[in-house]
Every structure is written in C-alpha cells, then in structure tokens.
Amino acid sequence: MPGNLSFKDRVVVITGAGGGLGKVYALAYASRGAKVVVNDLGGTLGGSGHNSKAADLVVDEIKKAGGIAVANYDSVNENGEKIIETAIKEFGRVDVLINNAGILRDVSFAKMTEREFASVVDVHLTGGYKLSRAAWPYMRSQKFGRIINTASPAGLFGNFGQANYSAAKMGLVGLAETLAKEGAKYNINVNSIAPLARSRMTENVLPPHILKQLGPEKIVPLVLYLTHESTKVSNSIFELAAGFFGQLRWERSSGQIFNPDPKTYTPEAILNKWKEITDYRDKPFNKTQHPYQLSDYNDLITKAKKLPPNEQGSVKIKSLCNKVVVVTGAGGGLGKSHAIWFARYGAKVVVNDIKDPFSVVEEINKLYGEGTAIPDSHDVVTEAPLIIQTAISKFQRVDILVNNAGILRDKSFLKMKDEEWFAVLKVHLFSTFSLSKAVWPIFTKQKSGFIINTTSTSGIYGNFGQANYAAAKAAILGFSKTIALEGAKRGIIVNVIAPHAETAMTKTIFSEKELSNHFDASQVSPLVVLLASEELQKYSGRRVIGQLFEVGGGWCGQTRWQRSSGYVSIKETIEPEEIKENWNHITDFSRNTINPSSTEESSMATLQAVQKAHSSKELDDGLFKYTTKDCILYNLGLGCTSKELKYTYENDPDFQVLPTFAVIPFMQATATLAMDNLVDNFNYAMLLHGEQYFKLCTPTMPSNGTLKTLAKPLQVLDKNGKAALVVGGFETYDIKTKKLIAYNEGSFFIRGAHVPPEKEVRDGKRAKFAVQNFEVPHGKVPDFEAEISTNKDQAALYRLSGDFNPLHIDPTLAKAVKFPTPILHGLCTLGISAKALFEHYGPYEELKVRFTNVVFPGDTLKVKAWKQGSVVVFQTIDTTRNVIVLDNAAVKLSQAKSKL
C-alpha cells in the first residue's frame, strides 16, 4: 500500500465515479484499503440517459487490483439517500463522502431556460444536499465523517455562459461552510475544492496543451489528505490544478463607518467615502479581516453613532429621477426601506409583496406624490414575469431590479426536511433567476439596467442551522458573478449586497444586544440606491460590477477572495503524504497572496505558478546555452529568408545573429526577478510588458555561447492602488570570458497589484537612454520608411526562441483574455522593426521602445524613422488596423560602423 495515510476499512462514497476525477478518486481510495461505493448514473455530460456500465467497470478494476467496491446507479438528486443506503447495507457505515457528480448545460443567460437552470442546480447542489443529509446521522453517531463538496472557479468567480453552473457550485460552498460549523463537535470535517482538472466537463473547453497538465491524478492527493482521519482541517476552500495547491479565504475590507442617522447617511455620503470602503488598509475603527463570520456590527454601530453628521461630498445623485425600480419583498423590512429611499431620489417604484404591498405604496405616495409607487402582489417564485409586466404596463419601462424577497426555514441539518430545503431555494435562488431573466431582454434592448441581488453573511460564511439558506444565498452570489460578466457587455450592471438589519425575518435570530442597537433597514438602503446610480460608475474611479458588499449599522465594506501563495509539486505522481509535508506552504497567506476576481485570473495565476516551478527546475543553474541553430531560428522568427544567408546559413562568412537577440536571455531570466515577491496580488494574467531597453556591450552578439543573466529590481512602485510598476535591470555575462555582453531593462505594469510602502523601490539606477522621451517630429517627413508584412505563422515560429506563452499560439486562450486570435510577441514586433533599422542605418548600441498596442500575425507593419545625430527616433504602425504599436522608440547608432 502506497504511503502511510491508510484508509483501511473506511467506507467511502463517491458520486459521479464512473470516469474522470471520480474514477481516479475511487481507485486511489481502494488502493489505500478503503471500501468504496462507486456511484454513477451513466448518463451523458448533459445528464440524459442511464447506463450502469461505467460504474461496473470501475468496480471490476478495483476488485482485480485486490480492492473492495460496490456499484450504485442511483441519481444523486432523485435518490441520493439510496446511495448512502448502499454503503450502510454493504459495509455498515459511511466515513467519507465525495460530492463529485455533475452535468453541464452551458448557454448564455439570455438564452437559458428555467429547466436548464434547474437541472444543473438539482444535480450539483441538491444532489450534494441529499447525499450529505442522508450520511449526516451516521456520521454524527460515529463521531466521525469527512465530506468534500466539489465547487469550481466558475462558482467562485463567475464564468460566461454558466449562470446555472456558477450558482450550483457556489451554493455547494455555502452548504459546506454551514455543515463544517454544525459538524465540528461531532468530528465531521467538511471542505470545498475548486479543481481545474481534465474531465469530460473540461476537455471541450480547455486547449490540449493545458489539458496535458490537468490530469485528475493531480487533484486526488489533496482530497485524500483532507479526508484522512488524522487531518483536522475543516471549513476551508482550496483551488488546485496541475500540481498547484492553494487555499482560498474571504478577505473583508476595513470599510468605512458613517453616522447612521438617515438625515445625513445618504448615497452621497457613501459615494464621498467610496475609496475608503474599497481599500483594504487597517483603520482606527476597524481592521481588514479574513473572517469566518459576519462583522462585529455591535462594535461598529457603537462607534458610528459617535460620529458627527456625514459629509455629503460634491456629487449629487440625480440619475434616479424618473427611473423605474422593481423591489421584491417590499411590504416591510429591507424591501420597504429600499422602496422609500428610491422614491426619495425621484424614482418610480413597483412595490412587490405577496401579502401586503398596499400600505407601503400608500405611505410612499403620501410622501412623494400620487403615482410614485404602485403595488404588485404576484408570487416571486411562480409569477416573476408578471411582476415585471406590472412595471411595463404602468411606466412603459423598468430600469432597476432589487431582488430582496426571502424566507427562513431554519433547522439543524439533522432535522432539516426536503420541503424546507426546496422552499428556501425557490424563494431566494429561483426567484432571483426568474426575475433577472424577466428583465434581461428589456435591459438588453435599452442597453442599460441595474440588478442588485441580496446574499447574506450566512451564504458567505455559513451559519449553524441554515444549510438551506446558506446554500441559496451563496448560490445567488455565484449566479450574480456570472450574469455580471454577461451583462457588462450589454450595459447591465449587477452587484450583490449582504445586509445586516433588523427585520421580521431576522428578529428571530438576532441577539438581545443586536435588537437593542436597532439595526434599522435605513442603514442598508443608501448603499442599494448608490449601487443603482450612474454616478457611482462615473465617479468611483473604476466600474463597480460583480462586486460583493457587506452593509449595516452605518458600516459598508467590500468582500473578496484571497488566495495563498500555495505549493506546486512538479512530480509526475503526487502522494497525499507530500501534501501533508507541505501543508504550511499550501496554506501560507504571509506572502505572495493574490486576490483573483475572475476565472481567467485565477486559472492563469495557477498555470503560471506551475510553469514557474517547472522553469525553476530547468533553470536551476541560471544558464542560457545557445548555438548557431538557435541564432538561425531567432532570425527566421523575425522574417529572415533563405535569400539572406548571413542570417540563415551558419557557414556564410558574414553569419550573424540580429542584435535584438540580446532580449532572449533577458526574457529567459524574467522569472528570476520574482515579481510575485516584489508586489502584492501579483497575477501573471494581469501583466503588461510596457517598455524595453537594451544596450549591447560588445560590437556584436556572439553566435553561440553560455550566458548568465543577473536580475535586480530598479523600481517597484504603486500606481494609485490600482496597479504596480516594476522595472528590472538584467546584466547578461559570458560565462567563459566573464565579460558583460548585454544589459536590458524591462518595465512591467501589473494591473490589480499593489505595492505597500515597505516594498517600494525608487532608487535603482536607470540607464539614461532608457528614461529619455523620444517623440516623433510632427510635420516632418521620415528619413526612412519600411513596410513589412508579417506572416500568419510568425508567432508560431518566434515562440520557439523561448517565449512559450500560449497567448501567442492558442486561439482558446486568446479569446479568454479578449483577443479574437493569438497575438504576435511584442519582442518579435520589436525585432522586426529593429532589423529594418539595422539594415538601413547599420549597427546600434542602445535601443528603447514602448509597447502601445498588439499585432496579429499576418498584419502589415510600417516603420517610420527620423535620424537626429547619432540617435534614430522611430515609430511602428500596424497599417492593417491603423494603430501605433511601438512608440517613444529610438536606437543609438554605433559611431564606429553605422551608416552615418
């Protein structure tokens, strides 16, 4: 038996185990002595059909290897309890449950049907509930249990075309967080994983070269470790792929407190302090936290009430005048408060409440004029389109939707019944889907609209006795993240709030202290009004889309994900013992954390970490070895042909590598700059190569040799908290002669990164030529022009010189980062331009460029140059798209040989 983490006689239930990740789980557990229930319905990826063969084949494979297993063919959402019954009947207990079964119904939200939404939620989320609920009494009585819920990056961050899947997967996180809290005293550990693994569900989405690294075998070791009897980890979330293992946790900003008096606690007051709400620095009244529960609102409101009246700032919220707002569950509590506040700002309000919308309408119309508000008593679950039709019939439009309606059916998980699960899911999650779906075509046609969805701290952090509510509210968050992505292209703004207020619904769970502090709904509504305003988008500094805010008691804060630096294993076979040995690295939040906000950011950061680990192994000696073959390959990558023998034939008497080959050892050494250590929240996916400079320290680049490049940071600067600038200096030496061959400076702009004061570097000595500005002389005819056609396959060829970033070859990845096709390497564009200058003006000693736009392989480039003494200022234009791609650019000619 491999390793020392034994599962001998433990009973493990795995759903969706007929193939992919589930199958690998089953084989791994069985190999370590577990008795395995292999569940698989045997349907298609879309969930149709039924075939017992898949589960039977896995069981046969386990038995042939000497293991113990039985098959089960039940549906997780229809007969989940029967899967657990199989374990009890065959083996007498259940110790480990892996909720892994899933289906996909990917389609844009505009085209998604309620059936497509419900089917995915049923299999993933309700299936997870059904299995966990059936296993719970056995695990409690045993005082032992381990449950893994399988989430997804799509659930954590949203993903285009997966509103159903995102909702279901994030719902599983909320469920797991609650079960972890309820199970703690019974030794039941519950965790969530968000794997990026090769499976039936991913093989049609991810490109082949990435899929090669994403074997499900790289996921299993963490799950084995988390479910072992010796492991105490619970209530945690992990991202993992291709040998990378990292932990995710919530990060809540210190936010801002306001005097909660509604006279001055207004949307304007919040806008005036927006920067403070969304920054993550500690403040005297509150610290940035990594919580497992809601804020200490009692402390915050006590401090807030001592503040003077709130400053209103210079911006008045006027954009809501005559806008039409639909607020659900507005007969009292938060909904009523929202409706009144919108009316106060000039909006027309549809007050929806299944019981009594009329008294609120009467109150609003008395305050703000007849016809300001109208009632609607349709059911949010079954009659969502009719609610929106009420708005259209009366006001001919709808601009804002606030999904607020809700119910509670709180019970400990042991006592929770299916009807209580479904009732809460329907009112919260399914009504949010249906109402958002009903306004979507209207907002799309208008090219504008706002949706504010309501989650809960129970959904974010889990809460004892609220498995149904936590799952529904977490699912709303995942759903909102996806429709925010899809809506952004249509002018539809979606955001999410987690309110803390005393209402009829929350009175039953509030403490005496909370009730005495009077957390009025009016302490939430000003933020809701602001989120529905155009002023926020205009004056906040960056668009506010798909964001999560916690609010109440005069306090507003933002909540986001934070990921640990993590651990990467580069071994072909990873064992859970390796996970155990490196647990401190996996859960290390002390350095190199990131705050991924999208699936692309997260996945790119993961794959970059893996690539860096592999590169570090390959470049342990830090040496760059090359031959004439590499020189020819580089020259060909810049467009040299067989007619240019001095560039393409090693026996030509004038054979040489083009001078810009100096950037190749620089590029190979950029990883040694360790930008992830220099800045906070480094994400490779957000890195832009801004400028490049190099100086040749020998008359020509050698055509073969062994070089070593030493890197050091010259500047590390914060750019207003929105980005970081890193400038690195790179000295390249010949190992044999010890002579300096070339010196490079690269400037990198990392969006979303931050540089705290203690990490700033300002005093690095820059090359004089690198920091000069070179403006093209306007109105003056260029001394030299050259038009160069790039080749459709140029990026495919140039990448063989060492830059294997898939962005330059993989259409799927290019589209994921918003490019229609793969782009040409910026250093290739530099090399093509510099070759034209080299052939016209002769050798140069120094070169500096700024990258201002991308080039697509096959585009035509025009190089324009103006000679000014020993300096040639130039500019490169992509004439196919009529954009400048290289600017602020110049070469300094060599005095000895240049064609002056």
Curated annotation (Swiss-Prot):
GO MF entries: (3R)-hydroxyacyl-CoA dehydrogenase (NAD+) activity; 3-hydroxyacyl-CoA dehydrogenase activity; enoyl-CoA hydratase activity; isomerase activity
MaoC-like domain ranges (all copies): 775-887
Active site (catalytic residues): 165, 169
Entry's localization field: Peroxisome
Pathway given in the UniProt record: Lipid metabolism; fatty acid beta-oxidation
Motif Microbody targeting signal: chain residues: 898-900
Region of interest (Short-chain dehydrogenase like 1), ranges: 6-230
Keywords assigned by UniProt, alphabetized: Fatty acid metabolism, Isomerase, Lipid metabolism, Lyase, Multifunctional enzyme, NAD, NADP, Oxidoreductase, Peroxisome, Repeat
Similarity-based family: Belongs to the short-chain dehydrogenases/reductases (SDR) family.
Domain notes: Contains two SDR domains.
Function: Second trifunctional enzyme acting on the beta-oxidation pathway for fatty acids, possessing hydratase-dehydrogenase-epimerase activities. Converts trans-2-enoyl-CoA via D-3-hydroxyacyl-CoA to 3-ketoacyl-CoA.
Name used for this protein in its record: Peroxisomal hydratase-dehydrogenase-epimerase
Organism of provenance: Saccharomyces cerevisiae (strain ATCC 204508 / S288c)
